[in-house]
């Protein structure tokens, strides 16, 4: 099977019979890189609340507190994955060679880029180094993953799913802070990569969804990733141009339509059991929330302000539920299981 790497709390818990040290080692070996998508979700929530402070007058302490949580979460998860890489390098190599898992490896570089935006005003120097490290790492990962797509021997159309957008989205995130730290041409370079290949991959993914079997339940939450490229693209474009023009509106309303399409299938998503892949709900929803708040700032007296408030409330609820369900899964030892 191609979708087995997301653990679920709906599965029965296997009694632990191994020695404690051996059990801990096994869990570390199977620590999923996809768990770093939770950092993207919390960072996105942070940015939404920080923007809400500027646009809606929301308490700044909420955004600042979430920024600390996102930073600590990234450090903790990166530590665990680093230990996994040192102790079980073959397990990491298997993830990199996996046709689906490999798309979650860039969550590391994307987390750095998002944290850079989180610290953009509070600690510009720290934000610069986070952005630089994230941009360089993500560009390298983009070349590696795109190269594997071209010179592959193990990909099939069934492997195509919205998670393939993750490497693309990172390139669109680079200009959000990059326009402050480097030449505008560099920001346009990354933006162009992300936007063009988003359209290419969107065609492939839609073909797979329409003409082949539906996504398995464990990958169904990744459909929300469809929201991310146009939402982040809108934010990056407005940051680079300083205006909401016709093209910016095309990006935003594309994201809004996709959100309405997903909302019309809300019952299906609510009926799904919890998987780690459910964190795919968080960052795309955060990106749409942030984009809506940006629209509210540029188009005053419109419905974007109440829409942004509603999306912020929904996003906060979604992240809180995901965090609670993840902690329950950790308590029950349902995470980090063998495939």
PLM region spans:
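Helix-coil boundary and interhelical linker segments in multi-pass alpha-helical membrane proteins
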Residues: 50-63, 118-128, 176-188, 237-247, ...
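Juxtamembrane helix-loop boundaries in multi-pass membrane proteins
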Residues: 19-48, 63, 67-70, 89-114, ...
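Structural signature of hydrophobic alpha-helical transmembrane segments
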Residues: 65-76, 126-139, 187-198, 247-257, ...
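Aromatic-anchored, glycine/proline-accented short structural segments
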Residues: 193-252
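Membrane-water interface of transmembrane alpha-helices
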Residues: 74-87, 137-145, 198-205
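Alpha-helical transmembrane segments in multipass membrane proteins, preferentially the mid-helix core
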Residues: 144-145, 176-177, 200-209, 232-239, ...
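A generic, well-ordered mixed alpha/beta core segment in the N-terminal half of proteins
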Residues: 113-150
């Amino acid at each position: 099977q191609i979708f087995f790497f997301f653990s679920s709390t709906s599965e029965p818990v296997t009694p632990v019979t191994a020695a404690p040290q051996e059990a801990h080692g096994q869990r570390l070996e199977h620590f999923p890189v996809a768990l770093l998508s939770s950092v993207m979700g919390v960072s996105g929530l942070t940015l939404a609340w920080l923007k809400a402070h500027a646009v809606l007058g929301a308490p700044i302490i909420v955004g600042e507190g979430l920024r600390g949580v996102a930073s600590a979460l990234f450090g903790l998860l990166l530590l665990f994955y680093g230990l996994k890489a040192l102790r079980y390098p073959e397990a990491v190599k298997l993830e990199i060679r996996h046709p689906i898992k490999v798309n979650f490896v860039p969550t590391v570089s994307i987390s750095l880029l998002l944290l850079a935006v989180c610290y953009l005003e509070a600690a510009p120097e720290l934000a610069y180094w986070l952005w630089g490290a994230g941009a360089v790492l993500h560009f390298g990962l983009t070349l590696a993953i795109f190269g594997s797509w071209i010179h592959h021997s193990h990909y099939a159309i069934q492997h195509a799913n919205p998670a393939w957008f993750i490497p693309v989205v990172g390139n669109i995130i680079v200009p959000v802070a990059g326009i402050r730290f480097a030449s505008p041409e560099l920001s346009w370079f990354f933006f162009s990569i992300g936007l063009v290949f988003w359209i290419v991959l969107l065609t492939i993914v839609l073909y797979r969804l329409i003409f082949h079997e539906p996504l398995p339940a464990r990958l169904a939450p990744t459909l929300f990733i469809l929201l991310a490229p146009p939402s982040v693209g809108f934010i990056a474009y407005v940051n680079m141009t300083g205006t909401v023009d016709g093209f910016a509106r095309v990006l935003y309303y594309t994201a809004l339509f996709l959100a309405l399409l997903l909302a019309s299938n809300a019952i299906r998503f609510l009926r799904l059991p919890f998987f780690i892949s459910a964190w795919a709900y968080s960052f795309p929803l955060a990106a749409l929330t942030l984009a809506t708040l940006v629209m509210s700032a540029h188009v005053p007296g419109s419905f974007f302000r109440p829409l942004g408030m509603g999306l912020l409330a929904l996003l906060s609820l979604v992240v809180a539920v995901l965090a609670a369900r993840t902690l329950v899964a950790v308590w029950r030892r349902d995470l980090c299981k063998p495939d």
